Amino acid sequence: QRLRLNCRRGLAVDGWWDKTLSEQSLVGTLPHGYYDDIHYGADYYTGHFVLEIPGRHKITDLAGVSPRWEISGGRLVVSAEIGTALGPVRKEILVDGDQPNFEIIHHFQWPSCPNGTLRLGHVTLNPELFEQASLFYRTHNGGDVAETFPLHNEPVNHLAPVSALVSASHGLGVTSGVVELGDARRWVRIEVEKSAAAVTGHILYAPVDERYFFRLVLSAMEMDDTSCHVASRAVFSDLTVRLRLTGRGRR
């Protein structure tokens, strides 16, 4: 495997390759200008977090860092501490030395966090690799059997706000801690430790410029008409969100 990180953007994943599945990257960053459509004129990173608080600037980990690295337990560990207005966030990338997989870990040390939305674990698929006609996502939503949802090239936006008080319209339970997304030949498996952080999953998909945009976003905090009465939360004073990415496919 090969993993390229962006030290100017808080160790965001520029690209991740699993050579057993493809010579092209499976996930990574789609830079500004990748799409001609002005509605998609942004950098679409993988592996970062975004905290949005009404009436305030966004807080992210997309800052320049000088990472430390070491070999521990047969894995490469790349780490950095990112200062924010709410407190430090420690970020670690763990790369397996034997099998093609890696982990992204965010450890939040925020004594108090205002009400808002905290989205992280962004995983952006490479639209030049996965076949558009057979794209799908799959997860458990409370049952014993995983549910598979073919996209059929229809737009999906689970993060579309319902109103000014309700920040997201749909979400995935991810009750087994696993989400898979890809096509009929190959897919990416994202595993999250739900016992440490009960995140929800959200899918974004749209056909764009004869290609498409397909991304999974995990959420650790959303807003609704009840949470708007909460001034701040202490749950992020010692919270770790950990996810592992593995490539899968049919031989």
Regions inferred by a protein language model and the residue ranges of each:
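Amphipathic, interaction-prone secondary-structure segments
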Residues: 4-5
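Beta-strand-rich recognition/accessory modules
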Residues: 1, 10, 17-33, 52, ...
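An exposed, glycine/acidic-rich loop-and-rim segment of catalytic or binding clefts
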Residues: 94-166
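Extended, charge-rich low-complexity regions and/or helical-solenoid scaffolds
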Residues: 32-51, 57-68, 92, 121-138, ...
